[in-house]
């Protein structure tokens, strides 16, 4: 068997998430159907680096799969790109060593979250940015977001009921900038892994801080007390993008 690594992007609006699930459309299922056709009807299973939720987009998701024979990477990329649905794009396909695993090889992820702060909102971006129509102070957001950097127990920012026991993660970069052309806020988070709904909960909290309904110090309190009820609401999935995955050499 020959192992291939692919980088893909997708519009998450019409997907119930990346991972295959019964009675719902998933990115995994669409790609596996195409690979099975290419593989003369023999089933092919893909393994993604991250499992994005329903409505979440990807600019640089990574996956791997095995095929019984060696193929030209660009020809395989072109075949997958043209035979998968229009809301999936294959950016690159390359042959990798048999021990490469998209999920378990050590890597870091970068996510972006787009918030439309226009009044009125941009209706063309309703599936691709979360609208926030209330006043915001960028300086408060900038002060608060840096407190998320470093190694912390992010229990207070994860969804209740998650099965993951170790909730300690390292965020290497957390920043926000204002995109004047689109009237958007762009949040960027990089780290060694993120918990279920962690980024959306962090953004929801930061927006309340920017709106002066929570103090800047609330971030430290949530981290210290590990209490989800102290954090803000969960921001919508439509603003979240898996931007990039970087593997250690």
Curated annotation (Swiss-Prot):
EC nos: 5.4.99.12
Catalytic activity: uridine(38/39/40) in tRNA = pseudouridine(38/39/40) in tRNA
UniProt keyword tRNA processing present: yes
Keywords assigned by UniProt, alphabetized: Isomerase, tRNA processing
Superkingdom field: Bacteria
Class of the enzyme per the UniProt entry, highest EC level: isomerase
UniProt-annotated binding residues for substrate: 111
CDD domains membership: PseudoU_synth_EcTruA
Coiled-coil portions: none
Pfam families assigned to the protein according to its UniProt record, in alphabetical order: PseudoU_synth_1
GO terms for MF: RNA binding; tRNA pseudouridine(38-40) synthase activity
Residues at the active site: 53
GO biological process: tRNA pseudouridine synthesis
Role description: Formation of pseudouridine at positions 38, 39 and 40 in the anticodon stem and loop of transfer RNAs.
Assembly and binders: Homodimer.
Family: Belongs to the tRNA pseudouridine synthase TruA family.
Name the UniProt record assigns to this protein: tRNA pseudouridine synthase A
UniProt source species: Streptococcus gordonii (strain Challis / ATCC 35105 / BCRC 15272 / CH1 / DL1 / V288)
Classification of source organism: Bacteria, Bacillati, Bacillota, Bacilli, Lactobacillales
Gene name, Swiss-Prot/TrEMBL: truA
